[in-house]
Protein backbone atom coordinates (compact mmCIF):
# COMPACT_ATOMS: atom_id res chain seq x y z
CA UNK A 1 0.00 0.00 0.00
CA UNK A 2 1.15 3.54 -0.68
CA UNK A 3 2.39 5.29 2.40
CA UNK A 4 -0.44 7.03 4.23
CA UNK A 5 0.56 10.52 5.28
CA UNK A 6 3.09 11.06 2.49
CA UNK A 7 2.30 13.26 -0.50
CA UNK A 8 0.92 11.01 -3.22
CA UNK A 9 3.70 11.74 -5.67
CA UNK A 10 6.43 10.93 -3.13
CA UNK A 11 4.91 7.53 -2.45
CA UNK A 12 5.28 6.45 -6.06
CA UNK A 13 8.34 5.14 -7.79
CA UNK A 14 11.05 7.80 -7.61
CA UNK A 15 11.94 7.58 -11.27
CA UNK A 16 8.42 8.57 -12.30
CA UNK A 17 7.66 12.16 -13.29
CA UNK A 18 5.66 14.20 -10.79
CA UNK A 19 2.03 13.20 -10.61
CA UNK A 20 0.62 16.71 -10.68
CA UNK A 21 1.90 19.29 -13.12
CA UNK A 22 0.95 22.95 -13.16
CA UNK A 23 -2.49 23.36 -14.65
CA UNK A 24 -2.99 19.61 -15.00
CA UNK A 25 -4.65 16.93 -12.93
CA UNK A 26 -4.21 13.20 -12.64
CA UNK A 27 -1.60 11.16 -14.45
CA UNK A 28 -0.40 13.54 -17.13
CA UNK A 29 -3.80 14.52 -18.48
CA UNK A 30 -6.34 17.29 -18.12
CA UNK A 31 -9.14 16.28 -15.85
CA UNK A 32 -12.33 15.94 -17.86
CA UNK A 33 -15.32 17.21 -15.93
CA UNK A 34 -17.93 14.53 -15.26
CA UNK A 35 -20.52 14.62 -17.97
CA UNK A 36 -18.18 16.10 -20.59
CA UNK A 37 -17.62 12.72 -22.19
CA UNK A 38 -14.05 11.50 -21.84
CA UNK A 39 -14.66 8.83 -24.46
CA UNK A 40 -16.60 10.93 -26.96
CA UNK A 41 -15.18 13.58 -29.26
CA UNK A 42 -16.30 15.58 -32.28
CA UNK A 43 -12.77 15.51 -33.68
CA UNK A 44 -11.64 13.04 -36.30
CA UNK A 45 -10.24 10.11 -34.29
CA UNK A 46 -6.56 9.37 -34.48
CA UNK A 47 -5.48 5.88 -35.60
CA UNK A 48 -4.88 3.04 -33.17
CA UNK A 49 -1.18 3.01 -34.04
CA UNK A 50 -0.75 6.49 -32.54
CA UNK A 51 -1.89 5.50 -29.06
CA UNK A 52 1.13 6.07 -26.76
CA UNK A 53 3.08 2.85 -26.29
CA UNK A 54 6.45 1.57 -25.04
CA UNK A 55 6.93 -0.17 -28.40
CA UNK A 56 5.42 -2.91 -30.52
CA UNK A 57 7.95 -5.69 -29.79
CA UNK A 58 6.08 -7.66 -27.16
CA UNK A 59 9.01 -9.87 -26.24
CA UNK A 60 11.40 -6.98 -25.65
CA UNK A 61 8.70 -5.30 -23.57
CA UNK A 62 8.22 -8.52 -21.60
CA UNK A 63 11.97 -8.81 -21.01
CA UNK A 64 12.11 -5.31 -19.51
CA UNK A 65 8.91 -6.00 -17.55
CA UNK A 66 10.45 -9.09 -15.99
CA UNK A 67 13.76 -7.31 -15.32
CA UNK A 68 11.87 -4.77 -13.23
CA UNK A 69 10.11 -7.66 -11.45
CA UNK A 70 6.88 -6.32 -12.85
CA UNK A 71 4.84 -9.50 -12.44
CA UNK A 72 4.11 -8.92 -8.75
CA UNK A 73 3.91 -5.14 -9.02
CA UNK A 74 1.82 -4.80 -12.15
CA UNK A 75 -0.58 -2.39 -10.40
CA UNK A 76 2.32 0.03 -9.85
CA UNK A 77 3.44 -0.63 -13.44
CA UNK A 78 0.06 0.70 -14.59
CA UNK A 79 0.45 3.86 -12.49
CA UNK A 80 3.92 4.49 -13.91
CA UNK A 81 2.65 4.09 -17.47
CA UNK A 82 -0.26 6.49 -16.95
CA UNK A 83 2.20 9.00 -15.56
CA UNK A 84 4.41 8.54 -18.61
CA UNK A 85 1.86 8.26 -21.43
CA UNK A 86 -1.31 9.95 -20.18
CA UNK A 87 -4.90 8.67 -19.72
CA UNK A 88 -4.67 6.01 -22.43
CA UNK A 89 -1.84 3.79 -23.59
CA UNK A 90 -1.34 0.46 -25.26
CA UNK A 91 1.15 -2.17 -24.28
CA UNK A 92 2.18 -5.49 -25.74
CA UNK A 93 3.69 -8.06 -23.37
CA UNK A 94 4.61 -11.26 -25.15
CA UNK A 95 1.71 -12.05 -27.47
CA UNK A 96 -0.85 -10.09 -25.47
CA UNK A 97 -1.67 -6.53 -26.52
CA UNK A 98 -4.02 -4.34 -24.48
CA UNK A 99 -5.26 -0.78 -24.39
CA UNK A 100 -5.36 0.65 -20.86
CA UNK A 101 -7.71 3.42 -19.78
CA UNK A 102 -8.31 5.13 -16.44
CA UNK A 103 -10.94 7.86 -16.80
CA UNK A 104 -14.42 6.93 -15.47
CA UNK A 105 -16.14 8.67 -18.39
CA UNK A 106 -14.11 6.56 -20.80
CA UNK A 107 -15.10 3.47 -18.82
CA UNK A 108 -18.78 4.37 -19.09
CA UNK A 109 -18.34 4.82 -22.85
CA UNK A 110 -16.52 1.47 -23.18
CA UNK A 111 -19.35 -0.43 -21.50
CA UNK A 112 -21.79 0.88 -24.11
CA UNK A 113 -19.89 -1.21 -26.64
CA UNK A 114 -19.65 -4.48 -24.70
CA UNK A 115 -22.58 -6.05 -26.57
CA UNK A 116 -25.13 -8.62 -25.46
CA UNK A 117 -22.47 -11.14 -24.49
CA UNK A 118 -19.67 -9.19 -22.77
CA UNK A 119 -16.27 -10.86 -22.88
CA UNK A 120 -13.55 -10.61 -20.27
CA UNK A 121 -9.94 -11.66 -20.58
CA UNK A 122 -9.51 -15.38 -19.93
CA UNK A 123 -6.56 -16.11 -17.65
CA UNK A 124 -4.29 -18.24 -19.90
CA UNK A 125 -3.12 -20.90 -17.39
CA UNK A 126 -6.67 -21.43 -16.16
CA UNK A 127 -8.02 -21.79 -19.67
CA UNK A 128 -5.11 -24.04 -20.65
CA UNK A 129 -5.78 -26.38 -17.73
CA UNK A 130 -9.48 -26.69 -18.57
CA UNK A 131 -8.74 -27.35 -22.24
CA UNK A 132 -5.82 -29.73 -21.82
CA UNK A 133 -7.59 -31.81 -19.18
CA UNK A 134 -11.08 -31.44 -20.69
CA UNK A 135 -12.71 -30.03 -17.58
CA UNK A 136 -16.29 -28.75 -17.67
CA UNK A 137 -16.68 -24.97 -17.65
CA UNK A 138 -19.22 -22.61 -16.11
CA UNK A 139 -19.94 -18.91 -16.55
CA UNK A 140 -16.31 -18.03 -15.83
CA UNK A 141 -15.22 -19.36 -19.23
CA UNK A 142 -18.38 -19.76 -21.28
CA UNK A 143 -19.12 -17.43 -24.18
CA UNK A 144 -22.13 -16.10 -26.08
CA UNK A 145 -25.42 -18.01 -25.74
CA UNK A 146 -23.97 -20.76 -23.55
CA UNK A 147 -22.76 -18.14 -21.08
CA UNK A 148 -26.06 -16.27 -21.06
CA UNK A 149 -28.10 -19.46 -20.56
CA UNK A 150 -26.17 -20.33 -17.39
CA UNK A 151 -25.94 -16.74 -16.21
CA UNK A 152 -29.71 -16.17 -16.34
CA UNK A 153 -30.25 -19.20 -14.12
CA UNK A 154 -27.53 -18.14 -11.67
CA UNK A 155 -28.87 -14.60 -11.50
CA UNK A 156 -32.17 -16.01 -10.21
CA UNK A 157 -30.59 -18.33 -7.65
CA UNK A 158 -27.55 -16.28 -6.59
CA UNK A 159 -28.07 -12.58 -7.38
CA UNK A 160 -31.81 -11.89 -6.98
CA UNK A 161 -32.96 -10.08 -3.79
CA UNK A 162 -35.30 -12.93 -2.87
CA UNK A 163 -32.42 -15.39 -3.06
CA UNK A 164 -30.18 -13.17 -0.93
CA UNK A 165 -32.75 -13.18 1.89
CA UNK A 166 -32.36 -16.96 2.06
CA UNK A 167 -28.62 -16.65 2.63
CA UNK A 168 -28.85 -14.53 5.80
CA UNK A 169 -29.66 -17.43 8.21
CA UNK A 170 -26.85 -19.45 6.62
CA UNK A 171 -24.15 -16.78 6.78
CA UNK A 172 -24.99 -15.07 10.07
CA UNK A 173 -24.14 -18.07 12.32
CA UNK A 174 -20.76 -18.44 10.60
CA UNK A 175 -19.87 -14.85 11.54
CA UNK A 176 -21.06 -15.47 15.10
CA UNK A 177 -18.86 -18.55 15.28
CA UNK A 178 -15.87 -16.51 14.11
CA UNK A 179 -16.45 -14.14 17.02
CA UNK A 180 -16.55 -17.15 19.35
CA UNK A 181 -13.27 -18.35 17.85
CA UNK A 182 -11.62 -15.00 18.64
CA UNK A 183 -12.97 -15.05 22.20
CA UNK A 184 -11.48 -18.52 22.58
CA UNK A 185 -8.12 -17.22 21.31
CA UNK A 186 -8.28 -14.35 23.82
CA UNK A 187 -8.81 -16.80 26.65
CA UNK A 188 -5.93 -18.96 25.40
CA UNK A 189 -3.50 -16.03 25.24
CA UNK A 190 -4.52 -14.98 28.75
CA UNK A 191 -3.74 -11.30 28.27
CA UNK A 192 -7.25 -9.96 27.84
CA UNK A 193 -6.77 -9.54 24.11
CA UNK A 194 -5.81 -11.53 21.04
CA UNK A 195 -2.82 -10.57 18.92
CA UNK A 196 -2.10 -12.36 15.68
CA UNK A 197 -2.32 -12.73 11.92
CA UNK A 198 -5.78 -14.16 11.19
CA UNK A 199 -5.28 -14.73 7.45
CA UNK A 200 -5.67 -18.50 7.70
CA UNK A 201 -8.73 -18.12 9.93
CA UNK A 202 -10.30 -15.82 7.35
CA UNK A 203 -9.68 -18.40 4.61
CA UNK A 204 -11.51 -20.99 6.70
CA UNK A 205 -14.29 -18.53 7.51
CA UNK A 206 -14.80 -17.76 3.81
CA UNK A 207 -14.85 -21.44 2.85
CA UNK A 208 -17.28 -22.30 5.65
CA UNK A 209 -19.53 -19.47 4.46
CA UNK A 210 -19.55 -20.30 0.76
CA UNK A 211 -20.05 -24.04 1.30
CA UNK A 212 -22.95 -23.39 3.67
CA UNK A 213 -24.63 -21.22 1.03
CA UNK A 214 -23.93 -23.75 -1.72
CA UNK A 215 -24.94 -26.91 0.13
CA UNK A 216 -26.98 -25.76 3.13
CA UNK A 217 -24.60 -27.64 5.42
CA UNK A 218 -21.69 -26.66 7.67
CA UNK A 219 -18.24 -28.22 7.27
CA UNK A 220 -16.95 -27.23 10.72
CA UNK A 221 -14.02 -25.13 9.48
CA UNK A 222 -14.10 -22.92 12.60
CA UNK A 223 -14.01 -25.76 15.09
CA UNK A 224 -10.94 -26.85 17.06
CA UNK A 225 -10.30 -29.74 14.69
CA UNK A 226 -10.52 -28.78 11.02
CA UNK A 227 -11.39 -31.30 8.34
CA UNK A 228 -8.13 -32.06 6.53
CA UNK A 229 -9.85 -32.61 3.17
CA UNK A 230 -11.50 -29.20 3.36
CA UNK A 231 -8.17 -27.62 4.29
CA UNK A 232 -6.64 -29.18 1.18
CA UNK A 233 -9.22 -27.36 -0.93
CA UNK A 234 -8.36 -24.02 0.70
CA UNK A 235 -4.64 -24.63 0.21
CA UNK A 236 -5.22 -25.59 -3.42
CA UNK A 237 -7.11 -22.36 -4.16
CA UNK A 238 -4.28 -20.37 -2.61
CA UNK A 239 -1.70 -22.24 -4.71
CA UNK A 240 -3.80 -21.88 -7.85
CA UNK A 241 -3.77 -18.07 -7.54
CA UNK A 242 -0.09 -17.83 -6.66
CA UNK A 243 1.10 -20.09 -9.49
CA UNK A 244 -0.98 -18.21 -12.07
CA UNK A 245 1.14 -15.04 -12.14
CA UNK A 246 4.42 -16.57 -13.46
CA UNK A 247 2.43 -18.19 -16.28
CA UNK A 248 0.41 -15.17 -17.39
CA UNK A 249 2.63 -13.90 -20.22
CA UNK A 250 3.82 -17.21 -21.65
CA UNK A 251 2.17 -19.01 -24.58
CA UNK A 252 0.07 -21.89 -23.15
CA UNK A 253 1.73 -24.30 -25.59
CA UNK A 254 4.96 -23.91 -23.63
CA UNK A 255 3.31 -25.10 -20.40
CA UNK A 256 2.98 -28.68 -21.56
CA UNK A 257 6.22 -28.62 -23.55
CA UNK A 258 8.52 -27.73 -20.66
CA UNK A 259 6.43 -29.01 -17.74
CA UNK A 260 7.99 -26.53 -15.33
CA UNK A 261 7.46 -26.93 -11.61
CA UNK A 262 5.17 -23.89 -11.59
CA UNK A 263 2.93 -25.47 -14.22
CA UNK A 264 2.94 -28.84 -12.45
CA UNK A 265 1.99 -27.14 -9.18
CA UNK A 266 -0.73 -25.21 -10.98
CA UNK A 267 -2.18 -28.39 -12.45
CA UNK A 268 -2.02 -30.14 -9.09
CA UNK A 269 -3.88 -27.24 -7.47
CA UNK A 270 -6.65 -27.33 -10.06
CA UNK A 271 -6.85 -31.13 -9.79
CA UNK A 272 -7.44 -30.82 -6.05
CA UNK A 273 -10.03 -28.08 -6.55
CA UNK A 274 -11.98 -30.19 -9.02
CA UNK A 275 -11.65 -33.42 -7.06
CA UNK A 276 -12.77 -31.89 -3.76
CA UNK A 277 -15.57 -29.83 -5.33
CA UNK A 278 -16.81 -32.91 -7.19
CA UNK A 279 -16.73 -34.91 -3.97
CA UNK A 280 -18.65 -32.30 -1.98
CA UNK A 281 -21.20 -31.79 -4.74
CA UNK A 282 -21.79 -35.52 -5.11
CA UNK A 283 -22.15 -36.09 -1.35
CA UNK A 284 -24.66 -33.29 -0.91
CA UNK A 285 -26.42 -34.18 -4.16
CA UNK A 286 -27.09 -37.71 -2.93
CA UNK A 287 -28.16 -36.36 0.45
CA UNK A 288 -30.59 -33.90 -1.11
CA UNK A 289 -32.14 -36.58 -3.32
CA UNK A 290 -33.19 -38.49 -0.21
CA UNK A 291 -34.99 -35.53 1.36
CA UNK A 292 -38.45 -34.28 0.49
CA UNK A 293 -38.90 -31.56 3.10
CA UNK A 294 -36.51 -28.94 4.48
CA UNK A 295 -36.91 -26.85 7.61
CA UNK A 296 -34.45 -24.25 6.29
CA UNK A 297 -33.18 -23.07 2.92
CA UNK A 298 -31.30 -26.10 1.53
CA UNK A 299 -28.67 -24.23 -0.48
CA UNK A 300 -27.98 -23.14 -4.03
CA UNK A 301 -27.11 -26.66 -5.24
CA UNK A 302 -30.57 -27.94 -4.37
CA UNK A 303 -32.33 -25.11 -6.17
CA UNK A 304 -30.17 -25.45 -9.27
CA UNK A 305 -30.99 -29.16 -9.41
CA UNK A 306 -34.66 -28.61 -8.65
CA UNK A 307 -35.08 -26.03 -11.41
CA UNK A 308 -33.73 -28.49 -14.01
CA UNK A 309 -32.63 -25.52 -16.11
CA UNK A 310 -29.03 -26.74 -16.20
CA UNK A 311 -27.48 -30.07 -17.02
CA UNK A 312 -25.90 -31.76 -14.00
CA UNK A 313 -22.44 -31.27 -15.53
CA UNK A 314 -23.09 -27.52 -15.85
CA UNK A 315 -24.34 -27.35 -12.27
CA UNK A 316 -21.16 -29.02 -11.03
CA UNK A 317 -18.94 -26.74 -13.13
CA UNK A 318 -20.60 -23.58 -11.82
CA UNK A 319 -20.57 -24.81 -8.22
CA UNK A 320 -16.85 -25.55 -8.57
CA UNK A 321 -16.14 -22.06 -9.93
CA UNK A 322 -18.12 -20.37 -7.17
CA UNK A 323 -16.40 -22.42 -4.48
CA UNK A 324 -12.95 -21.63 -5.91
CA UNK A 325 -13.81 -17.95 -6.29
CA UNK A 326 -15.31 -17.57 -2.83
CA UNK A 327 -12.28 -18.21 -0.61
CA UNK A 328 -9.24 -15.99 -1.22
CA UNK A 329 -11.21 -13.10 -2.71
CA UNK A 330 -13.59 -12.54 0.22
CA UNK A 331 -11.05 -13.37 2.91
CA UNK A 332 -8.45 -11.00 1.45
CA UNK A 333 -10.95 -8.13 1.26
CA UNK A 334 -11.88 -8.70 4.91
CA UNK A 335 -8.23 -8.72 5.92
CA UNK A 336 -7.66 -5.40 4.14
CA UNK A 337 -10.82 -3.98 5.73
CA UNK A 338 -9.66 -4.92 9.23
CA UNK A 339 -6.27 -3.41 8.44
CA UNK A 340 -7.81 -0.12 7.33
CA UNK A 341 -10.16 0.00 10.34
CA UNK A 342 -7.28 -0.66 12.70
CA UNK A 343 -5.33 2.25 11.17
CA UNK A 344 -8.32 4.60 11.19
CA UNK A 345 -9.81 4.26 14.66
CA UNK A 346 -12.07 7.28 14.21
CA UNK A 347 -13.66 5.61 11.19
CA UNK A 348 -13.95 2.38 13.16
CA UNK A 349 -15.85 4.21 15.90
CA UNK A 350 -18.20 5.76 13.33
CA UNK A 351 -18.90 2.30 11.92
CA UNK A 352 -19.44 0.86 15.40
CA UNK A 353 -21.86 3.62 16.31
CA UNK A 354 -23.88 2.96 13.16
CA UNK A 355 -24.00 -0.79 13.83
CA UNK A 356 -25.07 -0.34 17.47
CA UNK A 357 -27.78 2.14 16.50
CA UNK A 358 -29.00 -0.28 13.85
CA UNK A 359 -29.10 -3.12 16.38
CA UNK A 360 -31.18 -1.01 18.76
CA UNK A 361 -33.59 0.27 16.12
CA UNK A 362 -34.02 -3.14 14.50
CA UNK A 363 -34.50 -4.75 17.94
CA UNK A 364 -31.94 -7.39 17.03
CA UNK A 365 -33.51 -8.37 13.70
CA UNK A 366 -30.43 -8.92 11.55
CA UNK A 367 -32.39 -8.62 8.28
CA UNK A 368 -33.61 -5.17 9.30
CA UNK A 369 -30.14 -4.23 10.52
CA UNK A 370 -28.71 -4.86 7.08
CA UNK A 371 -30.90 -2.07 5.72
CA UNK A 372 -29.62 0.39 8.33
CA UNK A 373 -25.84 0.32 7.84
CA UNK A 374 -25.08 2.43 4.74
CA UNK A 375 -21.73 3.61 6.10
CA UNK A 376 -20.62 0.03 6.75
CA UNK A 377 -21.55 -0.96 3.21
CA UNK A 378 -19.71 2.11 1.94
CA UNK A 379 -16.64 1.00 3.90
CA UNK A 380 -16.55 -2.21 1.87
CA UNK A 381 -16.60 -0.13 -1.32
CA UNK A 382 -13.81 1.99 0.12
CA UNK A 383 -11.72 -1.09 0.93
CA UNK A 384 -12.18 -2.35 -2.62
CA UNK A 385 -11.15 1.07 -3.96
CA UNK A 386 -7.86 0.90 -2.07
CA UNK A 387 -7.38 -2.86 -2.41
CA UNK A 388 -9.37 -4.17 -5.40
CA UNK A 389 -9.40 -7.92 -5.87
CA UNK A 390 -8.49 -7.53 -9.54
CA UNK A 391 -6.26 -4.65 -10.65
CA UNK A 392 -8.04 -4.32 -14.01
CA UNK A 393 -11.48 -4.86 -15.50
CA UNK A 394 -11.43 -6.09 -19.10
CA UNK A 395 -13.72 -5.95 -22.11
CA UNK A 396 -13.51 -6.75 -25.82
CA UNK A 397 -15.74 -4.12 -27.49
CA UNK A 398 -18.23 -5.53 -29.95
CA UNK A 399 -17.63 -2.77 -32.50
CA UNK A 400 -15.18 0.05 -33.17
CA UNK A 401 -15.26 2.90 -30.67
CA UNK A 402 -13.38 6.09 -29.88
CA UNK A 403 -11.62 6.55 -26.54
CA UNK A 404 -9.61 9.69 -25.73
CA UNK A 405 -9.78 10.64 -29.44
CA UNK A 406 -8.24 7.33 -30.58
CA UNK A 407 -10.04 4.77 -32.73
CA UNK A 408 -10.16 1.39 -30.97
CA UNK A 409 -10.93 -1.50 -33.34
CA UNK A 410 -13.59 -4.04 -32.41
CA UNK A 411 -12.40 -7.04 -30.36
CA UNK A 412 -9.38 -5.15 -29.00
CA UNK A 413 -8.66 -6.03 -25.39
CA UNK A 414 -9.35 -2.88 -23.35
CA UNK A 415 -8.38 -2.94 -19.68
CA UNK A 416 -9.74 -0.51 -17.11
CA UNK A 417 -6.99 0.09 -14.54
CA UNK A 418 -9.18 0.15 -11.43
CA UNK A 419 -6.29 0.08 -8.93
CA UNK A 420 -4.68 3.09 -10.61
CA UNK A 421 -8.04 4.86 -10.85
CA UNK A 422 -8.64 4.35 -7.14
CA UNK A 423 -5.33 6.04 -6.29
CA UNK A 424 -5.67 9.01 -8.65
CA UNK A 425 -6.49 12.36 -6.98
CA UNK A 426 -8.19 13.44 -10.19
CA UNK A 427 -10.97 10.98 -9.39
CA UNK A 428 -10.81 10.65 -5.59
CA UNK A 429 -9.91 13.52 -3.30
CA UNK A 430 -7.24 12.57 -0.76
CA UNK A 431 -7.04 9.11 -2.38
CA UNK A 432 -4.82 7.44 0.23
CA UNK A 433 -7.28 8.19 3.02
CA UNK A 434 -9.69 5.46 4.15
CA UNK A 435 -12.89 7.50 3.99
CA UNK A 436 -16.14 5.55 3.50
CA UNK A 437 -18.19 8.75 3.60
CA UNK A 438 -17.00 9.62 0.08
CA UNK A 439 -19.50 7.05 -1.24
CA UNK A 440 -22.48 8.57 0.59
CA UNK A 441 -22.48 12.06 -0.91
CA UNK A 442 -25.45 13.33 -2.86
CA UNK A 443 -23.28 14.24 -5.85
CA UNK A 444 -23.52 11.02 -7.86
CA UNK A 445 -21.03 12.39 -10.41
CA UNK A 446 -18.29 12.00 -7.80
CA UNK A 447 -18.71 8.21 -7.81
CA UNK A 448 -19.90 7.73 -11.41
CA UNK A 449 -18.27 4.54 -12.76
CA UNK A 450 -15.77 4.45 -9.92
CA UNK A 451 -17.24 1.56 -7.89
CA UNK A 452 -15.87 -1.30 -9.97
CA UNK A 453 -14.56 -3.70 -7.32
CA UNK A 454 -16.98 -6.45 -8.39
CA UNK A 455 -16.96 -5.57 -12.07
CA UNK A 456 -19.91 -4.05 -13.88
CA UNK A 457 -23.08 -4.94 -15.71
CA UNK A 458 -24.32 -8.36 -16.71
CA UNK A 459 -20.80 -9.81 -16.54
CA UNK A 460 -20.04 -8.58 -13.02
CA UNK A 461 -18.93 -11.10 -10.39
CA UNK A 462 -21.67 -13.72 -10.06
CA UNK A 463 -20.92 -14.10 -6.35
CA UNK A 464 -21.11 -10.37 -5.63
CA UNK A 465 -24.28 -10.41 -3.51
CA UNK A 466 -23.07 -13.38 -1.48
CA UNK A 467 -19.72 -11.71 -0.83
CA UNK A 468 -21.28 -8.36 0.11
CA UNK A 469 -23.69 -10.02 2.54
CA UNK A 470 -20.98 -12.26 3.99
CA UNK A 471 -18.61 -9.34 4.60
CA UNK A 472 -21.31 -7.05 6.02
CA UNK A 473 -22.45 -9.67 8.55
CA UNK A 474 -18.86 -10.43 9.51
CA UNK A 475 -18.06 -6.77 10.13
CA UNK A 476 -21.26 -6.20 12.11
CA UNK A 477 -20.29 -8.91 14.59
CA UNK A 478 -16.64 -7.85 14.77
CA UNK A 479 -17.57 -4.22 15.46
CA UNK A 480 -20.06 -5.22 18.15
CA UNK A 481 -17.56 -7.39 19.97
CA UNK A 482 -14.05 -6.00 19.47
CA UNK A 483 -11.97 -2.91 19.08
CA UNK A 484 -9.47 -3.72 16.33
CA UNK A 485 -5.99 -2.18 16.44
CA UNK A 486 -2.65 -2.61 14.72
CA UNK A 487 0.05 -4.36 16.73
CA UNK A 488 2.63 -2.06 15.14
CA UNK A 489 2.05 1.19 13.29
CA UNK A 490 3.31 1.00 9.73
CA UNK A 491 2.33 0.51 6.13
CA UNK A 492 1.81 -2.86 4.51
CA UNK A 493 2.61 -2.96 0.80
CA UNK A 494 0.71 -4.92 -1.81
CA UNK A 495 1.92 -7.57 -4.23
CA UNK A 496 0.06 -8.99 -7.19
CA UNK A 497 -0.69 -12.70 -6.88
CA UNK A 498 -3.52 -12.49 -9.40
CA UNK A 499 -5.35 -10.86 -6.52
CA UNK A 500 -3.74 -8.13 -4.41
CA UNK A 501 -2.25 -9.55 -1.23
CA UNK A 502 -0.19 -8.07 1.63
CA UNK A 503 3.57 -8.35 1.24
CA UNK A 504 3.91 -9.40 4.89
CA UNK A 505 1.71 -10.69 7.71
CA UNK A 506 -0.77 -8.23 9.20
CA UNK A 507 -0.77 -8.55 12.98
CA UNK A 508 -3.97 -7.23 14.51
CA UNK A 509 -5.05 -6.72 18.12
CA UNK A 510 -8.61 -7.66 19.07
CA UNK A 511 -9.72 -6.10 22.36
CA UNK A 512 -13.07 -7.46 23.55
CA UNK A 513 -15.80 -5.41 25.16
CA UNK A 514 -15.93 -7.45 28.35
CA UNK A 515 -19.24 -6.06 29.55
CA UNK A 516 -20.87 -6.43 26.15
CA UNK A 517 -20.68 -3.93 23.29
CA UNK A 518 -20.68 -0.23 24.15
CA UNK A 519 -24.07 1.47 24.12
CA UNK A 520 -25.12 3.37 21.04
From Swiss-Prot:
Region: Disordered, residue numbers: 27-47
Residue stretches in coiled coil: none
GO molecular function: cholesterol monooxygenase (side-chain-cleaving) activity; heme binding; iron ion binding
Record key words, sorted: Cholesterol metabolism, Heme, Iron, Lipid metabolism, Membrane, Metal-binding, Mitochondrion, Mitochondrion inner membrane, Monooxygenase, Oxidoreductase, Steroid metabolism, Steroidogenesis, Sterol metabolism, Transit peptide
GO biological process, one term: cellular response to peptide hormone stimulus
Tagged with keyword Lipid metabolism: yes
Function: A cytochrome P450 monooxygenase that catalyzes the side-chain hydroxylation and cleavage of cholesterol to pregnenolone, the precursor of most steroid hormones. Catalyzes three sequential oxidation reactions of cholesterol, namely the hydroxylation at C22 followed with the hydroxylation at C20 to yield 20R,22R-hydroxycholesterol that is further cleaved between C20 and C22 to yield the C21-steroid pregnenolone and 4-methylpentanal. Mechanistically, uses molecular oxygen inserting one oxygen atom into a substrate and reducing the second into a water molecule.
Family membership: Belongs to the cytochrome P450 family.
Subunit text: Interacts with FDX1/adrenodoxin.
Protein name: Cholesterol side-chain cleavage enzyme, mitochondrial
Organism annotation: Ovis aries (Sheep)
Gene designation: CYP11A1
